[in-house]
Each structure stands twice: as C-alpha cells, then as structure tokens.
C-alpha cells in the first residue's frame, strides 16, 4: 500500500509561508533570469495565468491584477523540501523521494491498525503544522493508482479534504470512469491521442483493455501501467535514488558575455558547483567537459557553440582539479567577438568513494589533504550559506550572474535573512 504526498503549488507556497500578507492573493514564481511562469498558486490559476507565460509580456497585466511575482529562490525551496521529507520519514517506515515536492510512503501494515484516510489526514496535518505547507495525499495499492488518488485529492480538495483512499475497488472504478486517459501518470500527449483514436478515452477504458492488445500496439511500459491500474504492483518503492551517471551545471547568463575573463569566472563557478554536487553524491569523476554557446535566436548575429573535454587518469572530487580541467577546456573553444548566452560544465565517468584507484603515471596525483580541505569548505558553505567560501577564479562582482530581480530572502538558511519579530 502506497501513499503519494505532494505539496500543493510548492514553489509559490514556499514564498507565502513567510509572507502572511500574501495569503489569498495571486502569487507566481518565475524561471531562471525571470523568464516565464513556472509555478502559480490557486488564486493565480483562477485569473487564467498559465505555466510558461513570459514575464515581459504579462508584467503589465500582472500589475493590474495584483499578481505578486518572485524570482526562483532555489535555496529556500530545497530547505523547505528537506523539512517536508524529514517529516514524512518520521511518519512512514520507508519513503521514496520522487521529486522536490512529492514522495511515496510505504503504508504496509498500516491498514491493519489504522483507517487509511485518518492516517492520510494525520500526514497532512503534521506536515502543515511543521512547515505551513499543504500536501495532497493519495492512497492506493500501486504507485500509479496512488498518483491517480493524489490527483483527485488536489482536484476536488473541498470535497475530499485533500486525502483520497483508493484501496476500495468500487471507488477506484468510479474515479477512473470520471477521468480522461491523459490524467494517468506517464501517459503523454502522443500516447493519449493514439489511445483516443482507438476508443480508449477514460482511465477506466484503459484499465479494462486487454493486456495482449496493449502489448501488441504499444510497449511494456504501458502494459505495466495498465497492470498497476488493475491493482497489480509493478513499481516497487525505491528508498535510494539510483547513482547519477553525470552531473551538469549550466545557466543562461543574466547579460550576454563578450569578454574572456567574465566567461572564465562563470566556468570556474559552474565547475565549483558541479564538484560540490559530486562530493554530495560520494563520487569521483574522470571526465570534465565545458560548453559555451550564443543564442540561436539572436537576429543578425552568427551562431557559435562548441564544447571540449578533459579525461583525467586518476578520478578526483577536488574542486581545484575540476576547475583546472574545465578552464583548460574553455581555452580550447573560446572565440572572441561573440555574445555568449549560455555555458556549462559536465562531469562524467564516475567512481564510487573508496573504489577509485590511483595511477602511477598521472602527473596530477591527489593533493595532500584534499579530502579534508573539501570537507571543511563544504561544511562552512552548508552552515553559513553557499558562496561563503569560494575560489578567487569565480570572481567577486559577477555581472553575468542569473537575473533574479524579485528574489525573496533565504529565510531558513541565511542568518542575515531571518525574520524579525517586533
């Protein structure tokens, strides 16, 4: 038995938690460089604000309608996500963190001693009490059904109280008959169009379709979905995320970069951030790649994009080695005379901690005290805020940094941003 817990309008809700004056007002969160809408609360949806609406086209309308806009505050969202997930892990013996704002909880054995709907309400109330965030809870025998139940809990929140238990077969079929097939987890527009052309219009139609027909006309993924809709668990709980095969750190610049020193600062910053992520995964890497490119949509400007890479003999997780390799790659592809829009650093060819082997012929042998230095750096930045301790090559005044003109304070991770009670 699974419970899918999903925070309602997560990014927008994180902003209103610390701004009670915004409760009941339309709120949206914008993408990198304040480009377009990536999150909106219920009040913004009611005004017709759509995902992907460009900020520069809608800002006058937003101003007239009283829509409050925020730049993406990823530091705040990550910390609030950790608080939600920690709460869920206290309430359930096993939890799979599916994304920044949703998780599957294992309810095996709970129904023997608790009413599942009551337990879902307890989850919802506890998360609300500790974080002031509202979650929808969908409960069912399979992950796909739990997703469907969660969808219903959020769609009909007033009637359901934000909790839907689909463990009852009759209730399952009633809900499935009311939902279009494209509401099923994992069914995209292309597959839903094909199903519709075959006369499979509702979720119930799909659940009742012969498995052999699905296997013949589609693939094993959709077959698994149909089996899950019938209550047959095919997707197990994954408590530990699979090991990453690569790490990419890239951004579009707030302003176009035209000079080498600024680009080098950006590459140093991305390499340092990628190295930090690498260490958090307890991995070492041998492959470091750098790419730069201009905008393909810029009028009267020639397009240029290129990448270069370095393969180390000995795996590393030291930021200094990774920055050095990334800037060497930049030197191989840099061309003056362009207005660069984006750049990034990618790490690959990973080795687990304790598995990486030294190479006798490598000129770049591990630096003495490397692990201890990186640990001190990561600990300080985690405690005092990212960027407290950084490399000189990253620069001090980073004009190329991502635009976040409407950034809210980092209420939970920066001592200087703590709310003051008067």
UniProtKB/Swiss-Prot annotation:
* A GO MF label: single-stranded DNA binding
Asked if DNA repair is a keyword of the record, the answer is yes
Q: Which gene encodes it?
A: umuC
- Matching CDD domains, A to Z? PolY_Pol_V_umuC
Q: Which SUPFAM superfamilies match?
A: DNA/RNA polymerases, Lesion bypass DNA polymerase (Y-family), little finger domain
The entry's family comment says:
Belongs to the DNA polymerase type-Y family.
Which organism does this sequence originate in?
Answer: Escherichia coli (strain K12)
Give the domain of life: Bacteria
Q: What is this protein called?
A: Protein UmuC
Q: Which Pfam families match?
A: DUF4113, IMS, IMS_C, IMS_HHH
Q: What induces it?
A: Repressed by LexA, induced by DNA damage. Induced 1.5-fold by hydroxyurea.
What residues does the UmuC domain cover? 2-188
Q: Name one GO cellular component term.
A: plasma membrane
> What keywords were assigned to this record?
DNA damage, DNA repair, SOS mutagenesis, SOS response
Q: Does the keyword Nucleotide-binding apply?
A: no
Q: Which Gene Ontology terms describe the biological processes this protein takes part in?
A: DNA damage response; error-prone translesion synthesis; SOS response; translesion synthesis
- According to its UniProt entry, what is the function of this protein? Involved in UV protection and mutation. Poorly processive, error-prone DNA polymerase involved in translesion repair. Essential for induced (or SOS) mutagenesis. Able to replicate DNA across DNA lesions (thymine photodimers and abasic sites, translesion synthesis) in the presence of activated RecA; efficiency is maximal in the presence of the beta sliding-clamp and clamp-loading complex of DNA polymerase III plus single-stranded binding protein (SSB). RecA and to a lesser extent the beta clamp-complex may target Pol V to replication complexes stalled at DNA template lesions.
